[in-house]
Amino acid sequence: MDPEAFSASLFKWDPRGAMPPPTRLLEAAVAPPPPPPVLPPPQPLSAAYSIRTRELGGLEELFQAYGIRYYTAAKIAELGFTVNTLLDMKDEELDDMMNSLSQIFRWELLVGERYGIKAAIRAERRRLEEEELRRRSHLLSDGGTNALDALSQEGLSEEPVQQQEREAVGSGGGGTTWEVVAAVGGGRMKQRRRKKVVSTGRERRGRASAEEDEETEEGQEDEWNINDAGGGISERQREHPFIVTEPGEVARGKKNGLDYLFHLYEQCRDFLIQVQNIAKERGEKCPTKVTNQVFRYAKKAGASYINKPKMRHYVHCYALHCLDEEASNALRRAFKERGENVGAWRQACYKPLVAIAARQGWDIDTIFNAHPRLAIWYVPTRLRQLCHSERSNAAAAASSSVSGGVGDHLPHF
């Protein structure tokens, strides 16, 4: 064996294990660090919001302003509930949903969250109803205006009214996630606070006479005529004064005739039927008479010329028109010939109604309830008082005549 070959193979260096020279070590120490890996561009906030919106099904916009935590809304969406599902649920079903949420996820709902969920659903229902009413009134405005003008002969005037803007409802108790949603989502679901309208200086005075009560209620007409559908400049329909007209006569100029007045009562009946249908669909209590709910519905539908003070002011005139149309027409002709104003005609409508009540046992409530068009209206307090007074006078006259007749037949001592 060659010793040189053996020594060469024994002392052969492995290049993989060889250390670099000192100069190389110094270069490695001062070499710049490698560039960081290129990260994907951050996801835009709007895209994240859209993904979050799809995940929650719109619940974040529904609940954000009512103090519901984001985790609560996420768990409700995880259970499969959407905005449309919650809007169609009753209060009992909402309670069951919240109890299931607490039991399944071991998530204790705050007291404010339980009330906030129901409040948010009620507010969304009202918003959808107002949008539907505005849509219907816009569709019916072309066809309904012509018929209304034919009856009223320019009976309505439109006056711009400056209104204050509504305050937006502040966000509450949701954490940073809600803040991100609010910063991006904006105001599709802005909740508006209703401001109470301050009455214009007409004080209420408690008096026994129902006539004075009706006059006091007339001061609220401006409040009910104010349009609540948003801020800025809106249009308010102001009623022209009534004048006495004969049957079939159209009022001239900026006046309204009595046929138009009676037509308003027929419109109230139609609005009552619509309110009843809506209440039946929701499983709520149906009104059987024209109440404040009907007047609010009429105002939202665009019929702001229908208001409680005016309709109550002339309801006994409409009752005479329904119970005895011939007598009502004769009274209208007589007052038109004499040139009397509508106030005198209104006062004169009481006497025929009292005579009708006298022929039917003085029970004016039964008379109203028995008539299909009058059953939906409350009997005016003034009319009931007049019937009671006339009944007492008739009873006193009858008793005095009986006592006088008996005294004439008594023997004289």
Swiss-Prot record:
Q: What is its main location?
A: nucleus
Keywords attached to this Swiss-Prot or TrEMBL record, sorted alphabetically, are: Activator, Developmental protein, DNA-binding, Nucleus, Transcription, Transcription regulation
Give the Gene3D superfamilies listed for this entry.
Protein LEAFY
InterPro entries per UniProt: FLO/LFY_C (IPR035209), FLO_LFY (IPR002910), Floricaula/leafy_C_sf (IPR038276), LFY_SAM (IPR035079)
Q: What cellular component terms from Gene Ontology apply here? A: nucleus
Q: What spans are recorded as compositionally biased (Acidic residues)?
A: 211-225
Task: Output the Pfam families linked to this UniProt entry.
Answer: C_LFY_FLO, SAM_LFY
Q: Where is this region: Disordered?
A: 154-177, 191-239
Does Transcription regulation appear among the keywords? yes
* GO process annotations (BP): regulation of DNA-templated transcription
Positions with biased composition (Basic and acidic residues): 201-210
Q: What does it do? A: Probable transcription factor that act to specify determinacy in the progenitor cells for both flowers and leaves.
Give the protein family. Belongs to the FLO/LFY family.
Protein name according to UniProt: Floricaula/leafy homolog 1
Species, as recorded: Nicotiana tabacum (Common tobacco)
**Per UniProt, what is the name of the gene that codes for the protein in this document?**
FL1
